[in-house]
From Swiss-Prot:
UniProt record similarity statement: Belongs to the krueppel C2H2-type zinc-finger protein family.
Name of this chain's protein: Zinc finger protein 506
Zinc finger (C2H2-type) in chain: 201-223, 229-251, 257-279, 285-307, 313-335, 341-363, 369-391, 397-419
Assigned keywords, A-Z: DNA-binding, Metal-binding, Nucleus, Repeat, Transcription, Transcription regulation, Zinc, Zinc-finger
MF annotations from Gene Ontology: DNA-binding transcription factor activity, RNA polymerase II-specific; RNA polymerase II cis-regulatory region sequence-specific DNA binding; zinc ion binding
Pfam families: KRAB, zf-C2H2, zf-C2H2_6
Keyword Calcium: no
SUPFAM superfamilies reported in the protein's UniProt record: beta-beta-alpha zinc fingers, KRAB domain (Kruppel-associated box)
UniProt function note: May be involved in transcriptional regulation.
PANTHER family in alphabetical order: ZINC FINGER PROTEIN, ZINC FINGER PROTEIN 737
Keyword Ribosomal protein belongs to the record: no
Protein's GO biological process: regulation of DNA-templated transcription
Name of the coding gene: ZNF506
Cross-referenced InterPro entries: KRAB, KRAB_dom_sf, Znf_C2H2_sf, Znf_C2H2_type
Length: 444
């Protein structure tokens, strides 16, 4: 029997199999593989870092087998495991040493590891983890191959000491809470670290710590600014592959996240989550200044700028500042002359989408804004607002010269012309006025 290698305890997926896994299953697979590799190092087995581990640490897809290779023949176990497929019990034995590290819910003060488990079924923590990974593999093979033989399972113990433990049935480490036993002291050591909530992987830049090395690898990209995942359509880059996958939906136009209440679809799960609050009426984000509540934190952040008066978005052309980036984007069209919104009916173009929407009502005759007092309807909300002044008697437009007030801005503008005509002509230089040639007066 040859020395143990990482490939003896590894699971490999084809591209089709990988795409059948959901996010939770992929994370579980990644953690199990990384944990297996760390166990080999911990046991003193010198192994070079496999490509699979490098891919997992970088957040890449761990695809090592091609589709035609998977179909050509059933995947067999490497080296000395090539002759037999595994039984259900063998699979359980193989997973029990890694599942406990993944699921950290068995946290009790009186939990001590003195002897190991007889089987996965005895401990709820182990059983949940084993069933999760087993279902992950079973679902994948059923979708792709419809055959139980097309799956590689973790092999458990391969060195002579571990085989002796398995054959004799001696288990030295026990969990008092569930009566569960473990074959390895390393399992106890690792479990204690998880039970204590230890975060072994620390960032040298900022000191932030993580429980898993893959999480630290992802975090480091914040400091380096590395964005290895690039969109082929627009060139935009991301730090994580999951963010790139979400971004690609923009180009495809796909909206896979649908609201069960109203049927509206969204291209991002976070957008759907925010939308659901419309139906529930939930507004968890409250302004400390005025008490106004909002559905999302981003909306609250935009609102708070009203109180501070801050205008962080400045136009490079004219220096005008805005409190929202969207307003700056719209403003820039004045300088560029961009009129991107075109009417399909008459071909007229507009700088703003809102202007196009109002214009379209001229063709349709739609008047969606109705006065509750008299029932009169209008095409624009601003027109309705001005109309309501008739009923309230309000005169918000005041002349600075004489103090006279008006209910329309247009009426105020007309009124101002009276003051302009009444103002006398002031001559600053009398000499220039005297030097002006006078017309000849003829007396008949």
């Amino acid at each position: 029997m040859g020395p143990l290698q990482f490939r003896d305890v590894a699971i490999e997926f084809s591209l089709e199999e990988w795409h059948c896994l959901d996010a939770a299953q992929r994370n579980l697979y990644r953690d199990v593989m990384l944990e297996n590799y760390r166990n080999l190092i911990f046991l003193g087995i010198v192994v070079s870092k496999p490509n699979l581990i490098t891919c997992l640490e970088q957040g890449k897809k761990p695809l090592t087998m091609k589709r035609h290779e998977m179909i050509a023949k059933p995947p067999v176990m490497y080296s000395h495991f090539a002759q037999d497929l595994w039984s259900e019990q063998s699979i359980k034995d193989s997973f029990q040493k890694v599942i406990l590290r993944r699921y950290e819910k068995c946290r009790h003060d009186n939990l001590q590891l003195k002897k190991g488990c007889e089987s996965v079924d005895e401990c709820p923590v182990h059983k949940r983890g084993y069933n999760g990974l087993k279902q992950c593999l079973a679902t994948t093979q059923r979708k792709i191959f419809q055959c139980d033989e097309y799956v590689k399972f973790l092999h458990k113990f391969s060195n002579s000491n571990k085989h002796k433990i398995r054959d004799t049935g001696k288990k030295s480490f026990k969990c008092i809470e569930y009566g569960k036993t473990f074959n390895q002291s390393s399992t106890r050591t690792t479990y204690k670290k998880i039970d204590a909530g230890e975060k072994r992987y620390k960032c040298e830049e900022c000191g932030k710590a993580y429980k898993q090395s893959s999480h630290l690898t992802t975090h480091k990209k914040i400091h380096t600014g590395e964005k290895p995942y690039k969109c082929e359509e627009c060139g935009k880059a991301y730090k994580q592959s999951c963010n790139l996958t979400t971004h690609k939906i923009i180009h495809t136009g796909e909206k896979p996240y649908r609201c069960r209440e109203c049927g509206k679809a969204f291209n991002h799960p976070a957008t759907l989550f925010s939308h659901k609050k419309i139906h529930t009426g939930e507004k968890p984000y409250k302004c400390d200044k005025c008490g106004k509540a909002f559905i999302s934190s981003s909306t609250l952040t935009k609102h708070e700028i009203i109180h501070t008066g801050e205008k962080p978005y400045k136009c490079e052309e004219c220096g005008k500042a805005f409190n929202r980036s969207s307003n700056l984007t719209k403003h820039k069209r004045i300088h560029t002359g961009d009129v991107p919104y075109k009417c399909d009916e008459c071909g007229k173009t507009f700088t703003w989408y809102s202007s196009l929407s109002k214009h379209k009502r001229a063709h349709t005759g739609e008047k969606p804004y109705k006065c509750e007092e008299c029932g009169k309807a209008f095409t624009a909300f601003s027109t309705l607002t001005e109309h309501k002044i008739i009923h309230t008697g309000e005169k918000p437009y005041k002349c600075e010269e004489c103090g006279k007030a008006f209910n329309w801005s247009s009426a105020l503008n007309k009124h101002k012309k009276i003051h302009i005509r009444q103002k006398p002509c002031i001559v600053k230089n009398v000499e220039n006025l005297l030097n002006v040639p006078q017309p000849l007066i003829s007396i008949r």
